[in-house]
Amino acid sequence: MRRFSFIFCLLLLLGLSSCEDFLKQTSQNLVTPTTVSEYKDLLQGEGYFQEFSTHARFINFMTDDMEYINYPGSSPSTSSYINMYQNVYCWSQEIENDNFKDEWYGYLYSQVLAGNICLEYLDEVLGSDAEKKVLRGQASFQRAYAYFLLANTYGEPYDATKLGEKCIPLTLTATPVTERYERATLGEIWAQIKSDIAVAVECLRDYSAASNFEINYDAALLLAQRVALYMNDYQLATTYGDMLLERKCDLWNISELGPMLTCSKQSNDGPSVTGQTEGF
C-alpha cells in the first residue's frame, strides 16, 4: 500500500510540474540579443534617429527662417501645416491647439533608450573587444546626439555662468524605474554630452564603416565640433574641425546657394516659405 501511495504522489508531482511548464507564457516573437552584431542591429532598428524630420518639422517654425505668404485665393485654414504649427512661434504660457501634439520630446528619449540599452549590456554580450569598442562608440554617439537635441530644444542655452540651472531629465540606464525623473542641471547635461561624444570619437577612430549610413568616425568628429561650438569652447571646436577637414577636405561654398524653399511656391525675398501647398 505504501508503495502505491509513493508512486501516486510521484506521478502527481510530475503532473503538476508539467502543467506549470505548459501554462508558462512565452512570447512567440521575442528575441533577446546576445551578440555585438545583434545589439548593433537593435541600435540601427530602434535608434539612428529614423523619422527624424517628421518629428522635428515644427522646430523650423520656431525660427525666423520661416515666412508665411498669404497667396491670393489661399487661406491659412486650408493648409494643414499652418493649422498644425501656427502656434509654435507663440510666446503665450498657455497654448491650446488640438491639431498639434509635440512628439519630439518622447521620440528623443526613445533614442536615448536605444543607446542606453547597448551601453548597459555591452560587457555581457558575445563579441571581440574590437567589436565591443565600435558598439560603445556608436551607442555613445546615439546618446550624445539625443541629449544634445533635447538640451537645445527644451533647456536653456549653454552658459558657463548658469551651470546650476535646471535643464532636462538625465537617465543613463535602460532599467525602468518607478520614481519620477528629476531635471538635471545644465552643467550635468552638457558634461554628459561632452563625455559621450569624446568616447564616440575615441572608439570610432580606427573603424571603417561599411556604408555612409552607419555611425562612423567622421560623424563623431562633426558632432563633437558642434558640441564644442555650442559650449563656446572655440579652441576645441577648431581642433575637431581640423581633424575632420584632414579627412574630408572638400568644402561647399554655401554663399553661392540661393534661397531654400520648403514648398513649390517661388519667393523673391524670403529665405524659406510655406504657403497653402502641401509640399513641405
Name each model-derived stretch:
Residues L13-L16:
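Bacterial Sec-type N-terminal signal peptides, specifically the leucine/valine-rich hydrophobic h-region
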Residues Y81-Y154, A184, A198-D206:
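Conserved, well-structured interaction surfaces
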Residues A151-Y158, S208, Y230-D233:
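Short coil/turn linking the two alpha-helices of tandem helical-hairpin repeats
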Residues C19-E67:
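Membrane-proximal, proline-rich intrinsically disordered regions
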Residues A56-F58, N232, T238-F280:
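Hydrophobic-face positions in mid-chain alpha helices that act as interaction patches
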Residues M1-F4:
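Positively charged n-region of N-terminal signal peptides that target proteins for export
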Residues A114, I189, D196, C203, ...:
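Alpha-helical solenoid repeat scaffolds, predominantly canonical TPR units
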